[in-house]
């Protein structure tokens, strides 16, 4: 039982515990520590019982203090007064690493627990706190710096953070500069940045609202401000993404700069940009830091599908904004698609085959292939498949695309095609032993795995593995359940098979809620938690090590669905997380780094420097 007295009790509380010999009472004073601290401070002010005098390194002013008090608040003083240091027995100690202002601030804090900071005394206080290892004061200094960062002082705060190794402050300053760099360009404050911080900013994917040409001009201004800075020209230019500039800007604004024509590194950067722009089809396999999208926004992306009500096929490309918890539109495809294949190489999204019209038999399959470039929010057509195909699987593996099986007006397909971006052409590789459609696939360890599907109107449970180096298929341990129109993905070293459908009895279809994963090293399957609701013919994507299953069709409910279910492999749990804007079957999903639409509205100003040849054959 706890007993507390009123306001006049001097903050006393008591805990009462009955025992055989009577009641034991434990008392606690809530004001004792502050009273003792005030008492020590008064002793210091009056010069009573002080047993050592501290002298700052920059003067002769003396500060009488109590050894025990200083040692209790500082590991530095504890080591000095209790270890084998010569200062242990000295009555007067000169602290050469601390000045008068800093030492007074530290002593006042130790005796009062209070600290006043401004930009005039901050560095003296920081230096003393760092030298004397007063961690609370260091924390207060960090809070003071972070809370006061502005366009006018961010460069100076960054310098202080770097000098005293204040990692949290340094990180905050970097983020502040990245967020406000356009404003710093306008004010000219960026010219005061040290090389290391400017190079970091220019290399960052988090730098927004600046074109590469603007960044190049800013770098040139910084270099020309002081002659010694020109030594950094090549190192600084490595952070400018010249391949993303237009050829006109490269000629008119970049090649006219003297050091870009004379410095070997800079000349090579221009050659790199020229070569990159001359080979638009190869770009996905030519990616580097200088050709990557300048964005740190990676999102779940969905594409196409057939609408539940009108059975109209969609051409929408959407991303899910996790912060706003809403779907946002990117550039739509030129033609609608469902039952298509999608894959990503070098953050370029390929859309292959599928259908533009609703047709459950696959008779309207197409062979066209398009590629989405998120840097410019634009689509371009590339070489078409050798065969029209839908209800097939598409994988990206070792810089190539593999289109596996499917169906068309000619029937079920066993053929497999490989797309080479370097040549912009499709060629046949080893076909499957039997035709398959409605199967699923994923890649792991340089191999492609294909599971289940439908062959001659029969659902399958087999797992096949394709090795692109040997151009051979091998059989692996079969799934425990036959399924088709399911999905498959890789997380870590496990290959997950999820959802789909199969026959109930002899003719009716049934959702498959059971899920399992395959271990390539053990060649065996392990069951996992079942889905909350059936989904077939879905989009699937792995985002932050969670599996997202998007849209599709529920055979038990006989309708397209709008739900998105998330599976957590670590917890073995399913959750319904959000919905699509509408119910869509035959939709596809992936993850892609993009410019969120508010940063790239329609993108008239974000012009692509790349022009593909008009012949798509």
Swiss-Prot record:
Q: Where does the BTB domain lie?
A: 50-119
**What GO biological process terms does the UniProt entry carry, in alphabetical order?**
cell division; protein ubiquitination; regulation of cytokinesis
Keywords on this record? Cell cycle, Cell division, Kelch repeat, Mitosis, Repeat, Ubl conjugation pathway
Return the annotated region ranges for Disordered: 595-617
| Pathway annotation from the record | Protein modification; protein ubiquitination
Task: Domain (BACK): give its ranges.
Answer: 154-255
Q: Name one Pfam family in it.
A: BACK
Cellular component terms per the entry's GO annotation: Cul3-RING ubiquitin ligase complex; midbody
Q: Does the keyword Repeat apply?
A: yes
The UniProt entry annotates Kelch repeats at 299-347, 348-399, 400-446, 448-493, 495-545, 546-594
Which terms does the record give in the GO molecular function aspect? cullin family protein binding; ubiquitin-protein transferase activity
- Top-level taxon of the source organism: Eukaryota
UniProt entry tagged with the keyword Cell division = yes
Function according to Swiss-Prot or TrEMBL: Substrate-specific adapter of a BCR (BTB-CUL3-RBX1) E3 ubiquitin-protein ligase complex required for mitotic progression and cytokinesis. The BCR(KLHL9-KLHL13) E3 ubiquitin ligase complex mediates the ubiquitination of AURKB and controls the dynamic behavior of AURKB on mitotic chromosomes and thereby coordinates faithful mitotic progression and completion of cytokinesis.
Q: How does it assemble?
A: Component of the BCR(KLHL9-KLHL13) E3 ubiquitin ligase complex, at least composed of CUL3, KLHL9, KLHL13 and RBX1. Interacts with AURKB.
Q: What is this protein called?
A: Kelch-like protein 9
Q: Which organism is it from?
A: Mus musculus
**Gene assigned in the entry:** Klhl9
């Amino acid at each position: 039982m706890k007993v507390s007295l009123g306001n006049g009790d001097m903050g006393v509380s008591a805990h009462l515990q009955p025992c055989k010999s009577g009641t034991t009472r434990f008392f606690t004073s809530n004001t004792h520590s502050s009273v003792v601290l005030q008492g020590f401070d008064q002793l210091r002010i009056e010069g009573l019982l002080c047993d050592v005098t501290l002298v700052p390194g920059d003067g002769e002013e003396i500060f009488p203090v109590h050894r025990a008090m200083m040692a209790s608040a500082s590991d530095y003083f504890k080591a000095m007064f209790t270890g084998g240091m010569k200062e242990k027995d000295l009555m007067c100690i000169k602290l050469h690493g601390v000045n008068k202002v800093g030492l007074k601030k530290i002593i006042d804090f130790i005796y009062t627990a209070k600290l006043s900071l401004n930009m005039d005394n901050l560095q003296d206080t920081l230096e003393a706190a760092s030298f004397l290892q007063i961690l609370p004061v260091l924390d207060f200094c960090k809070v003071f710096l972070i809370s006061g960062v502005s366009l006018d002082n961010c460069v100076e705060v960054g310098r202080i953070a770097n000098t005293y190794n204040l990692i949290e402050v340094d990180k905050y300053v970097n983020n502040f500069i990245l967020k406000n760099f356009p404003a710093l360009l306008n004010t000219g404050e960026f010219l005061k940045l040290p090389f290391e911080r400017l190079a970091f900013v220019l290399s960052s994917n988090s730098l927004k609202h600046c074109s590469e040409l603007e960044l190049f001009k800013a770098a040139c201004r910084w270099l020309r401000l002081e002659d010694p800075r020109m030594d950094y020209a090549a190192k600084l230019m490595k952070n400018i993404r010249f391949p993303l500039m237009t050829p006109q800007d490269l000629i008119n604004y970049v090649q006219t700069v003297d050091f870009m024509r004379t410095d070997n590194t800079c000349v090579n950067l221009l050659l790199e940009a020229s070569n990159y722009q001359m080979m638009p089809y190869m770009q996905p396999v030519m990616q580097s830091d200088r050709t990557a999208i300048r964005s740190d926004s990676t999102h779940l992306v969905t594409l196409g599908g057939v609408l539940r009500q009108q059975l109209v096929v969609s051409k929408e490309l959407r991303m899910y904004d996790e912060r706003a918890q809403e779907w946002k539109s990117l550039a739509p495809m030129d033609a609608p698609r469902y039952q298509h294949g999608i894959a990503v190489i070098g953050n370029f999204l390929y859309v292959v085959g599928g259908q533009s019209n609703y047709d459950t038999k696959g008779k309207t399959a197409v062979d066209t292939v398009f590629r989405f470039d998120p840097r410019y929010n634009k689509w371009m057509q590339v070489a078409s498949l050798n065969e029209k195909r839908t209800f097939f699987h598409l994988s990206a593996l070792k810089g190539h695309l593999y289109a596996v099986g499917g169906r068309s007006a000619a029937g079920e397909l066993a053929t497999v095609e490989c797309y080479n971006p370097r040549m912009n052409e499709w060629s046949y590789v080893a076909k499957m032993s039997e035709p398959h459609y409605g199967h699923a696939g994923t890649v792991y360890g340089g191999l492609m795995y294909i599971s289940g599907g439908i062959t001659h109107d029969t659902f399958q449970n087999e797992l096949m593995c394709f090795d692109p180096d040997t151009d051979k298929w091998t059989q692996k341990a079969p799934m425990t359940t036959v399924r088709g129109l399911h999905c498959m993905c890789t997380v870590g070293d496990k290959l997950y098979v999820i959802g789909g459908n199969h026959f109930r009895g002899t003719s009716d279809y049934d959702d498959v809620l059971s899920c399992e994963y395959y271990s390539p090293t053990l060649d065996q399957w392990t069951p996992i938690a079942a889905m909350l609701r059936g989904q077939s013919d879905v989009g699937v994507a792995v985002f932050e090590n969670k599996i997202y299953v998007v849209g599709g069709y529920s055979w038990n409910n006989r309708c397209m669905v709008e739900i998105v279910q998330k599976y957590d492999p670590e917890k073995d749990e399913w959750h319904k997380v959000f919905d699509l804007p509408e119910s869509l079957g035959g939709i596809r999903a992936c993850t892609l780094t993009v410019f969120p639409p508010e940063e790239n509205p329609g993108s008239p100003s974000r012009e692509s420097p790349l022009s593909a040849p008009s012949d798509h054959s």
